[in-house]
Amino acid sequence: MTTTSVCPFSKAARPDDGSTRKQGEITASGCPFSKAARPDDASARKQGETTASGCPFSKSARPDENGSKGCPEQEGNLNKDSTDSATVPAKCPFGYDSQTFKLGPFSCMLCQALLYESSRCVPCTHVFCKVCLTRFKDCPLCGADIESIEVDENLQKMVDQFIEGHARIKRSVVNGTEKEEVENDNKKVIYADVSMERGSFLVQQAMRAFSAQNYESAKSRLAMCTEDIRDQLGREGNTPELCSQLGAVLGMLGDCSRAMGDSSSAVKHFEESVEFLMKLPLNDLEITHTLSVSLNKIGDLKYYDEDLQAARSYYDRALNVRRDAMKHHPNAPSQILDVAVSLAKVADIDRTLQNEVAATDGFKEGMRLLESLKLDSEDSALEQRRLSVLEFLKKQVETDAETAL
């Protein structure tokens, strides 16, 4: 049995959870604001969905304004009735074909997120994010030599205006010398071919940028999310939903900082994530998983800084959180696996600290848990993970036995 995402900030809060020091700690993908369907799922598109009238950006919501469903440069070139199996259909780089989600007019073709630090190739004038473009010597779209790169401030202003007007949970309208807050919490973002909750949209853009290693872009979008959620907390108080959302977004910010090599900022974000998640009742598997992952990631960073006592403290806290969750959900296989992984982390630190007895006990306890775990045949992914962690634990016990001889 696998756990399904129920918390509004489920396991998506950790886009690089598989990168932790030990293998076997894996989270499933999903949006932290999981009320919306996956934006890149073709089945989530609604027929006849149009942008709201009166928006200054509405005319540019579709480059093919006349109703064409294909890329203008490719229209008419593809014979859908062709039976030639050797012919590979051309793909529009902007996604205007039936097989992929559409990229909006303010998106970077490379990271597929909203443009950040918009930069234009010279002389071909194609526009991408600065970080994405600097990896190429030729234009990724047309192949022309890049003689120089120019900042496109006007386009970036339009992107920023779109975000402020449409993607933020709230926006402010200047009224004389005062700022009047206009609430838009229940309105959705309609961009390209999807309609999403406002918070979900920014998190989606951050996750796309993170996957493309455009960490500055991801960090910028997540910072907006934290600002908006903090504002909501100020108005509505520490509700479980908002605390879980903020805890997960802060964890994602920690991942960005860690990927950028800023371990001190990463620890700060993870610790703040833990602070908010600890305010929630720990009877929800998604909340306890996110909390334990944040604690483990702080432990990893302390371990890399060679602060072994601090690392063990955080690993042990994560283990205790997972033990409590296993007591409340004794029939959740993923929770048992998480406990075994935490036991391995703590035992490994104990061995490094030359506490061999505690280390061996930890490895053996993890082995007993995994050997007694019975999975259904459809849980192939969990079974693979169980075998991987079990093999690691057995090797550690064998090493201890050889050392004792």
Curated annotation (Swiss-Prot):
Which residues form the TPR repeats? Answer: 247-280, 292-325
Q: What induces it?
A: Up-regulated upon H(2)O(2) or salt treatments.
Q: What is the effect of changing residue 129 to A?
A: No effect on the interaction with CAT2, but no increase of catalase activity
The GO molecular function terms of this record are: zinc ion binding
Could you state one GO biological process linked to this protein?
positive regulation of catalase activity
Keyword line: Chaperone, Cytoplasm, Metal-binding, Nucleus, Repeat, TPR repeat, Zinc, Zinc-finger
> Which segments show compositional bias classed as Basic and acidic residues?
13-24, 37-48
Q: Which domain of life is it from?
A: Eukaryota
Quote the function comment for this protein. Has holdase chaperone activity that may fold catalase to a functional structure. Not required for the peroxisome import of catalases. Required for the activity of catalases and acts mainly at the post-transcriptional level.
UniProt note: domains: The RING-type zinc finger domain (1-158) is involved in the increase of catalase activity and zinc ion binding is required for this increase. The interaction with CAT2 is through the C-terminal TPR-containing domain (159-405).
- Name of the protein this chain belongs to: Protein NCA1
Chain's gene name: NCA1
